[in-house]
Amino acid sequence: MKISYDKIADALYIYLRSGKVAKTKKITKRLLVDIDKKGNVLGIEMLEVSRQIPKKEIGKIYSEMPVYA
């Protein structure tokens, strides 16, 4: 699993597995899930992250697990 955070877009992406995205399912206004053609979840995208998670907590993600930008 990899996590990336784009400060400019204020978006966090959690990579769960590699593969080609067949569709993106909108769970909420700020939460999207990428799915392959077999129905496997490839990744989760959170939009407007700083509205949901305090910026100091976003920083902890980087210190507690590998994060790739």
Over which residues does each language-model region extend?
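Short, acidic, Ser/Thr-enriched surface-loop or helix-capping motifs
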Residues: 6-7, 36
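A short acidic/small-residue loop/turn micro-motif
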Residues: 20, 48-51
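Short loop/turn motifs at secondary-structure junctions and domain boundaries
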Residues: 23-26
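A short, polar/charged loop-to-alpha-helix boundary motif
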Residues: 51-63
